[in-house]
Amino acid sequence: VKLKREKPEFKNLKYKKIISYLSKMDNSRSDIALVSNKKILETGTSNLLFVKDQKFFTPKKDFYEGNTYKFFKRKIKKIIKKDILIKEIKNYDEILLVGSGKGVTSVRTIDEIKWKRKNLEKFKFLSKHYDLVINKCNTYRFN
């Protein structure tokens, strides 16, 4: 979707437009990418981490840094910030969605550009760290 947050530090800016796209799909199986000037910024529900040659990459700017993204920033020794161009996505081995609702999820395919994940190595690494923290949390039931 050709859309970016005008002030990425504020999560809710233009969120109604994002929700209108998300409401038309099964969010447990798919998401929308927010793209501006041929650069991918984030998804409708999550931040993005790209993996190539064992290194993590993230968009340089113009995206909202969610809490789960901030958690992983502390766990990953180095995340390289760069413009993630649509035409270069085929070069990445893994694409990971990170967000409060999803935790960490591995993108299997992007049909529109014929991208397919090459492995799950970094996904498994991040999932392990995330699950350790989440499983320590108390749960409360509200009736």
Regions found by a protein language model. Give the residues of each.
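Helix-start/capping segments and mature chain N-termini
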Residues: 1-143
